[in-house]
Amino acid sequence: MMEQIKQYEYVDLGLPSGLKWAKYNVGAEKETDYGYYFQWGSTKPNTADECIWENYKFYNSAKYSLTKYCTDSLYGLFGIVDSKTTLGTEDDAATQIMGSDWRMPTEAEFQELLDNTDNEWIEDFNGTGVNGRKFTSKTDTS
C-alpha cells in the first residue's frame, strides 16, 4: 500500500515494528533514480567519488580518528568512543532534506527489513538500464 508523508511516498511492507519505508532513496524523484550519496552523518550530498575518508565530516585526518559515531576506542579520537549508532537529527540526511517526519533507518531496522521481506537484485529494471535491489512484502499489506 502506498501512502504519503508530505510530498514523499512510503510503502508499508508489513514489518513487525510497523515501520514504513520511503519508496525512493533520499534525493530520488522516482524508482529509477539512484538519489544522493551520503557519508554516515553527513547531510550534504556527494558524488560517489567524494565518499572517501578524507572527506568524512567526522574524520580527523591528522589523527586518523573518528570524532563522532564511534563505537571502538581503536578508531576514536584519543581513544574516546561515543557509542552512537543512531543519527542525531542534525546529522540525518533524510530529516534535513525530507523533513522531521523522516529519518535514516538504524542497523536493527535494516535487519528487520532483510528478515521480513523478499528481496532480489534487479538488472535493467523495466528496460531503464537501472540496477538495484527490490524489496517485496512477505505479507499482504493491502
Region locations from a protein language model:
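Conserved positions within compact, well-structured domain cores
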Residues: M1-S142
